[in-house]
């Protein structure tokens, strides 16, 4: 089992630079520390509230390939932290959260929440119209008292107000649909929403209803219809990512925590 603060993923050191601008949703111009200006792929196509700051430091991965249009990928962004006026690095690659949560489960870090898991299948078709894909479908071990399959939806969470993480940071009809789909699998299966908090300076999670009021309403409805919420926090560094533990959550920005 990986302990709090320990490394969950290692990788070659990222390059650092200054963000010049993001444009056309998928592209970002960045000046590297040696003065070279490169164009990087930006996997996060949302507004990136509180994270998209031209002039601030960012980290990139260099991975040239004939199959890629761009050699660089924007991975992390430095933002002001709420802990003692320090800085915090935020993970902005939206393809990482599913991998991080899968690593957590395989390392038995969520055994208390899920019990023993015999297998994990990603991107399984499910839902009311069989047109959605669940991020992770967990199959419990035969030793588990609860033999129901576990449907896990993962949401990359980078926006915050003080030490409160919020998702979403814009209106998301897709996210609303995912909550409805999770509600539809309960009680025959377990339904779990995991906000993957891609920064370490967070104490609580709440729905970002100031950006999407309907999502906030559906979030609270989902809680009454069996959907479990397990916010998981991670720390981002130049050559590794750490497991920072489970955070409590609130039904809204003002409500009591769980």
Curated annotation (Swiss-Prot):
Top-level taxon of the source organism: Bacteria
Record InterPro entries: SfsA (IPR005224), SfsA_C (IPR040452), SfsA_N (IPR041465)
A molecular function GO annotation: DNA binding
Family: Belongs to the SfsA family.
PANTHER family named among the record's database cross-references: SUGAR FERMENTATION STIMULATION PROTEIN A (PTHR30545:SF2)
Designated name of the protein: Sugar fermentation stimulation protein homolog
Organism: Prochlorococcus marinus (strain NATL2A)
Encoding gene (name): sfsA
